[in-house]
Regions:
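Glycoside hydrolase catalytic-domain context in secreted enzymes
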Residues: 1-123
Length: 123
């Protein structure tokens, strides 16, 4: 969501609240680890757990916990060799488990996923 996780966390909350108070569902993207645009479908992100949580996830966490975002769009990249949309750790353990996200989770357009695996891991 940006280069500065603290700033992004502070900015995303009022923006989501302003959108959603007008009966429109806000959707944040790209969850998670969308680190580059060029060849983004070929990226296999392998951050440490600390880096994941301190750099890449804070704004998404704020969007869920503080703003109650209704929509979340996944990213094109892989996470340790698995499409980020199909990652049990990202989707089931963190997003839905720890943060309690109950909104819509959708893929970006033309994401190459295994439908069964995606469904089994919360997409």
């Amino acid at each position: 969501m940006g280069e500065d996780p603290i700033l992004a966390s502070k900015l995303v909350v009022p923006q989501i609240k302003a959108i959603q108070e007008n009966d429109v569902a806000a959707t944040v993207k790209h969850f998670a680890l969308n680190t580059q645009e060029l060849n983004r479908t070929g990226v296999n992100a392998k951050p440490t757990e600390r880096t994941l949580r301190e750099v890449y996830l804070p704004a998404f966490e704020a969007a869920v916990k503080e703003a109650g975002v209704l929509g979340m769009m996944g990213s094109y990249n892989q996470y340790f060799g698995t499409n980020a949309n199909q990652s049990k750790h990202l989707v089931m353990d963190i997003l839905k488990g720890e943060w309690g996200y109950q909104g819509v989770l959708l893929t970006d357009w033309n994401v190459d996923i295994n439908t069964f695996d995606a469904a089994m891991h919360g997409l």
